[in-house]
Every structure is written in structure tokens, then in C-alpha cells.
Amino acid sequence: MFQQSSSLEHKKIIDDKTYLIGSAGKMLIVDSILIALDYSAQPILHLFDIKNNIYINGMGEKGQGPNEFLHPTSLIHSSTNSFLIYDLLDNTLKKIWLDSLMAGNVFYEKIMNFNSISNSFVFPTAYDNYIAFGLYESNMFKLIDQHNNDIGYFADFPVKSKEEKKIDHRNIALAYQGTLNISPDKKKIVYVSYYGTIIGIYDIQSSVINQKFLLVCDYPMYTVQNEGSGMSSPITKEGISAFRDVYVTDKYIYSLYSGNKISELRERAFEAKDIYVFDWEGNPVVHYHLDVPINNIAALPNDKKIYAISNLPDPTLIEFEIDL
């Protein structure tokens, strides 16, 4: 599928003794600042100056107090001086200004507190509404207006068979969980699956979401285990650990892929050393094979460098030079 392939070697750019990351999460580049989420430790935000190659600071605390976070899961570009965080556990989209972070202060504005606890990801669109992805009774996406009302539900997971369609849709959504990112113009969104091997690109309009591209190489292998009011769709040991992260620029989609069998490598199955780059039409551009496994990715807007965090053995910020 990918006619162009290249091997990349990493470079450490910042002294790893100047920072300590617990469990590296999503990353975002705003101007010359790289922001990285930390899922397991405090501070929850790490700031790197990738122009001068220095660690700026770590900040942000978990909690329910003013300007604290419960469980932030995504970073979303907002402007040259701000970004958004979706906090999963309090269903809130929060806006943060870089100026305040650079001054050592964490201050956010709550943009919207959503009604549903079923949203895994929420992004603002170009049409003054929001696109959400989550564990719904039908479909995989929904649009929400500025007044917190549902506009409608759209698209669905590409299940393997008619029999699978008879399963409770929330179980399907649990098995087909993945990660997403929205284009800089906020008019397109990409979904990649954590298990199986699925990538989908969708056009966003003011009142509808249309599937533009879909690639299915493998389906998630799972069982349904519902007891009482609880729901579960555990992945079997024969399942494939697929995409670990996805990052986007104006031109390209960078998908970080593992492809390992969980039964063979266990925890190491979630290590990823391959980046598959697509354009926004779904055309394959290039396959990068990395010299070290990484946890997440970010790319410069000009598509000249990829940044990642790799366990070397401690979580360390590294870069790869590319030429797209």
C-alpha cells in the first residue's frame, strides 16, 4: 500500500535530567511550544520550548479545585496563544492561554460543560458546534450545538458481520475505542482504532458528518462480558494492538502504529515503531520505521520534524527529521 518507506533515527534534543514524566499522553505544538499531557503524575502538563530546546516547566494539578483537572484526555489547537483540553471525568472543554502557562500560572476558561458522560472526545468544529465521539447507543459520532443540544448522531463502526450488529452498540463502541484528531480548519476528523486496524476520515458539516475514507485491515477481537449494570468488551489475547496515537497538520495525518499481537508481547505489544502518513483524502504518503519505540507523536506544521516521547528507559522527548 505504501510505496514510499523510510527509516528514521531519533535525536535527544533536551537534557532528560531537567524533567520527569510519568505516563506520556497526548501532545500538541502551539507556536514554538510543545505541550505534553502526563496521565499518571503531577504536574499533568509539561511545556517544552522546541525552538531553543529547553524544558520550560511542569504544571497543573489533579483535583476538583479551581483550575485543577480530573482526567484530561486530549489537547486541541485553538489559536497561536491558546489551546483546549477535554476533561473526560467532568465532561468539560477548557481553554488555556499560553501566556499564563509561560508565567507559571494555570488558568482556564470553561468553554462548555456537556450533558453526556458517554463522550470520550469532544472537538469544536468550524461551524460553531461540537463533534463528539463516544460510547453511544447508536452510531460513533454526534454533533452538539452551542446550547448543549444534540443535533444528531452519525456514521458507525465498520463491524465484521451481521451477527456483530446484534450486540449492544455500547459493547461495540467499547471494543472499537480509538483516538482521534481534528484538522486545523476544523472541517475534518480522523479516527484510528486501538485494536484491530482501522482508520477513517470524516467530513464535518454544520448538521451532518459524512465518511470520506475508510481502511479496515483487521477487526478488534473481543468478548462481551456484561454483568448487572456493568458493561465490558475485553480484547482477547489474540487481538492486535493497533494505533497508539494520531496527529494532524494541514496536509497530513500521522498515525502511530504498533501491529503487535497482545498474546506474544503482552505489555510490550503496545510499543509502536511505525508511523503511517496519509493525506486528508486517505491516500498513503509514506511509511516511517523508527529506531526506537515511542508512546505518542506530534509534528511541526511545516511537516519537517516529528516529536515523540520514548522510554529510554525513562520517558524522554525526542525528535525525528523528515522531509515531506
Regions found by a protein language model. Give the residues of each.
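Beta-strand-rich domains and repeat architectures in extracellular enzymes and scaffolds
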Residues: 13-43, 247, 251-261
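Structural signature of eukaryotic scaffold interfaces centered on beta-propeller domains
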Residues: 23-28, 73-78, 120-127, 170-185, ...
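Asp-box/WD-like beta-propeller blade repeats and closely related beta-sheet repeat scaffolds
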Residues: 90-91, 97-134
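Conserved blade-ending motifs and adjacent loop-strand segments that build the rim/top face
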Residues: 218-228, 280-301
